Amino acid sequence: MAKESYKRDKPHVNIGTIGHVDHGKTTLTAAITSVLAKQGMATLREFSDIDKAPEERERGITISTAHVEYQTAKRHYAHIDCPGHADYIKNMITGAAQMDGAILVVAGTDGPMPQTREHILLARQVNVPALVVFLNKVDIADPELLELVEMELRELLTEYGFPGDDIPIIKGSALKALEGDPEAEKQIMELMDAVDSYIPQPVRDIDKPFLMPVEDVFSISGRGTVGTGRIERGRIKVGDEVEIVGIKPTAKSVVTGIEMFQKTLDEGQAGDNAGLLLRGVDKNALERGMVIAKPGSITPHTKFKAEVYILKKEEGGRHTPFFNGYRPQFYFRTTDVTGSVTLPEGVEMVMPGDNLSIDVELIAPIAMEESLRFAIREGGRTVGAGSVTKIVE
């Protein structure tokens, strides 16, 4: 019967568990499903079931990710959990699992560890909007130590640009909750209340300003030029003004027709594969890699800072390191653009399997904003992935 209640009448939010290895991320994920399942809000997922996460490919990169869904009284959640540290890095950088917020799991017995730091930094770099902390294993931790751990955590979060003083820190034991201990189950509900109230409701794609990456271009004699692609966000109506951004100087146009599967529409929206007929645009003025967007909503850039992950040899990546001045292609949305890489001071070379911050200068401008994801390619083969962290010019 519980299955029936999975109607999409609640707002949807994507979250995930992050934190150091063995601090209890997967146990917590299982505990959340176990506690909510008792209220008919989830299907119980065993630890072992979540732990052997299936492999997926995202932008040519293999990532193991477990997907769990559940709901609270207020929201419907899709929750991701990764078995390995490298999977988290890849997930966050490729945006395979776009997180609207995350639960940072820290063992009260250990306090913040190196991967705790790395995950907080990554969450900051790839713009995860909000974090809630679950201080785990409090049943076996020294109470005085817990106070120190909490202080240290708040300082660490502040250091990385999160509001450390305001972030909810919920203390509990995921294992005890999973075993059905009533007090520990209450702590899980407390955590979910914090997630409900502290992680902001994301703006739905359809409510964002219109943007469609151009995949293909053709002309209809006597009517004009059509750009086709999948609408990434927002909605578009016949008669709307748009800008064509990237590669060449930005141009303005008006949408005079919208087609989907050979049918004409009045409106296209996020997720639709559509063809847009553009007034007064020459066929040569539109090409793959440009975007058609709401005027003023996005601008073209060539220089940016990025957080990147470089594939290991075993993942199909490079076999050798690269150095300052490396010139691969950067694949944004629908096209490759060559760019040169400047490494951070003190970094001589980058090995396959590394993740780091780099500066990039492209040979042609691309419609860009912070958090935009891209692949790094060499002759069509993916060798890395990245996320724009800051636009320089």
Swiss-Prot record:
Region listing for G3, in residue ranges: 81-84
Region feature G1, mapped onto this chain: 19-26
Reactions catalysed according to its record: GTP + H2O = GDP + phosphate + H(+)
Group of enzyme by EC: hydrolase
Domain tr-type G: 10-203
Residues involved in Mg(2+) binding: 26
Source organism, top-level taxon: Bacteria
Primary residence: cytoplasm
Gene Ontology CC: one annotated term: cytosol
Its EC number(s): 3.6.5.3
Keywords attached to this entry: Cytoplasm, Elongation factor, GTP-binding, Hydrolase, Magnesium, Metal-binding, Nucleotide-binding, Protein biosynthesis
Region of interest: G4: 136-139
A GO MF label: GTPase activity
InterPro entries: EF-Tu_GTP-bd, EF-Tu_GTPase, EFTu-like_2, EFTU_2, G_TR_CS, P-loop_NTPase, Small_GTP-bd, T_Tr_GTP-bd_dom
Assembly and interaction partners: Monomer.
Similarity comment text for this entry: Belongs to the TRAFAC class translation factor GTPase superfamily. Classic translation factor GTPase family. EF-Tu/EF-1A subfamily.
Physiological role: GTP hydrolase that promotes the GTP-dependent binding of aminoacyl-tRNA to the A-site of ribosomes during protein biosynthesis.
Protein name: Elongation factor Tu
Organism: Chlorobaculum tepidum (strain ATCC 49652 / DSM 12025 / NBRC 103806 / TLS) (Chlorobium tepidum)
Gene from which the chain derives: tuf
